[in-house]
C-alpha cells in the first residue's frame, strides 16, 4: 500500500450534492487501518476570534492582531473537536509533526497562542475531520471519487480557501472536467 499521507484529495466534479462537493482534503494519516484528513476549503461561518470567544479563551483581544481567519469544517466526523494544521512550532500539549513543514495540534493551548508571538506563522483551524475505515479510501479512489496530489505549503496556507479546489485541480496539469467519472478495467 502506498500511503497518501501529506497529500491532498481533490473531489471529482461528479461528486455533486454531497458534503464533499468540490472539497480539498489534507490527509494527515493514511495506513492499512484507514485514513484521516481535514477539509481545507469549507468555512463554517465563524472566524477564529469568534471561536475563541465561544470557547472563552479570548480574555483580552489584541486589537492589532487580526484573527479574522475563517474556521473551516474539517469533515463530518466529531465536529465539536478542533484541529489546528500549522507550520512547525513546538511546546504544545498534543502536537504531531506530519512533515518538516506541517504539524497538527489538537490541544487548546495552541488556540490560546493565536494572535501572540508564540503562534505558528501559518495555521488553519478546523472543526471535525474526514475519516475512512480500512480500504474505504482505496475503494473511493478506484471509483474515481477523488484525485490526489502531493500537498504543498503554498496550497495549504497561501491560497485563499475559496480558491483551493480550483488551484489544486489546475496543479494536475489537465482539465479535470474532461475526466470521466466511470472506472473500469482494460
UniProtKB/Swiss-Prot annotation:
InterPro entries documented for this protein: AlgH-like (IPR003774)
Transmembrane segment boundaries: none
Superkingdom per UniProt: Bacteria
Pfam short name (any one): DUF179
GO cellular component: cytosol
SUPFAM superfamilies for this protein: VC0467-like
PANTHER family in the record: UNCHARACTERIZED PROTEIN YQGE, UPF0301 PROTEIN YQGE
HAMAP family, per database record: UPF0301
Family: Belongs to the UPF0301 (AlgH) family.
Protein name (record): UPF0301 protein Swoo_1337
Organism name: Shewanella woodyi (strain ATCC 51908 / MS32)
Amino acid at each position: 500500500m502506498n500511503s497518501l499521507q501529506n497529500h491532498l484529495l481533490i473531489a471529482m466534479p461528479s461528486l455533486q450534492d454531497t458534503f464533499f462537493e468540490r472539497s480539498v482534503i489534507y490527509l494527515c494519516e493514511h495506513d492499512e487501518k484507514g485514513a484521516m484528513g481535514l477539509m481545507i476549503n469549507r468555512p463554517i461561518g465563524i472566524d477564529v476570534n469568534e471561536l475563541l470567544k465561544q470557547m472563552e479563551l479570548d480574555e483580552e483581544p489584541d486589537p492589532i492582531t487580526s484573527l479574522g481567519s475563517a474556521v473551516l469544517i474539517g469533515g463530518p466526523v466529531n465536529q465539536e473537536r478542533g484541529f489546528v494544521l500549522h507550520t512547525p512550532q513546538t511546546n504544545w500539549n498534543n502536537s504531531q509533526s506530519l512533515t518538516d513543514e506541517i504539524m497538527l495540534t489538537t490541544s487548546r493551548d495552541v488556540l490560546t497562542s493565536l494572535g501572540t508571538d508564540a503562534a505558528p506563522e501559518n495555521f488553519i483551524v478546523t472543526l471535525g475531520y474526514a475519516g475512512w475505515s480500512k480500504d474505504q479510501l482505496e475503494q473511493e479512489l478506484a471509483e474515481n471519487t477523488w484525485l490526489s496530489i502531493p500537498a504543498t505549503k503554498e496550497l495549504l496556507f497561501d491560497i485563499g480557501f475559496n480558491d483551493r479546489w480550483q488551484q489544486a485541480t489546475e496543479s494536475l496539469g489537465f482539465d479535470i472536467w474532461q475526466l470521466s467519472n466511470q472506472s473500469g478495467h482494460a
